[in-house]
Every structure is written in C-alpha cells, then in structure tokens.
Amino acid sequence: MSIVGIVIVSHSPKVAEGAADMVRQMVGLEVPLAWTGGGPAGELGTSFEAITEAIHRAWSDAGVAILVDLGGAETNSEMAIEMLAEEKRSRVVICNAPIVEGAVIAATEASGGANLATVRRTAEELSP
C-alpha cells in the first residue's frame, strides 16, 4: 500500500526542518517526507527548483501533500507542480493549513493509510 507523501515548504530552513522533525518524531519513518526552505545562502526564501526536488524525494503513487508557510512558498509550489510530468500533477496538492499543525495531522492521516483527498481535507480542517 502506498502512503501519501508530505512536503514542507517554508521561507526559513529552520522552520521547515523543525516541522519535519516533529512529523518524524510523531509518526515515524513510514511516511515519505521532505522539506525545503530558505535561499542558497541560507537567507529567507523559497525556490521552485528545490520544491520540485522535495516533491520527488517524498514521491508516492498515493500522491503528495504540500504544506507552505507564506504566499511565495505557495506560488513557487504551484510552479513546481506545473513543472512535473502531466501524470504526476494531479497527484500533488497544496494544503491550505497551518504549516506545523497541518504537517503533523496530514502525516498522521497518511500513516493510517488515508488517501490524498482525506489527508488534504483533514489538514485543512485546522484552518480558521
């Protein structure tokens, strides 16, 4: 059984890594997980190339849920999705959810075998 992968995208590499660390400690290693954040010199920012690489690292035939912090992360995630092969695009979604809580609940759902739509819906239920 394929498990939905999770990608965490933050402008801060420390935030992205910290959120990923929380996910790992709470759900273990079975959920495909990748994170990316910051610019090439460690400054704040995001890169659609790095996001594309993270999607590939977390890839699962069950799909990939992306959690982002701010607008630029979402825009670059959308660009990264558009750069994927056509057959993969429909299996990658951006969740409108708080990055830390959303990543944890999305990974928890994924670890239980939930499909991509359920993972996304559950994460987005955390939004105000």
Predicted regions located by residue number:
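N-terminal loops that bind phosphate or other acidic moieties
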Residues: M1-P128
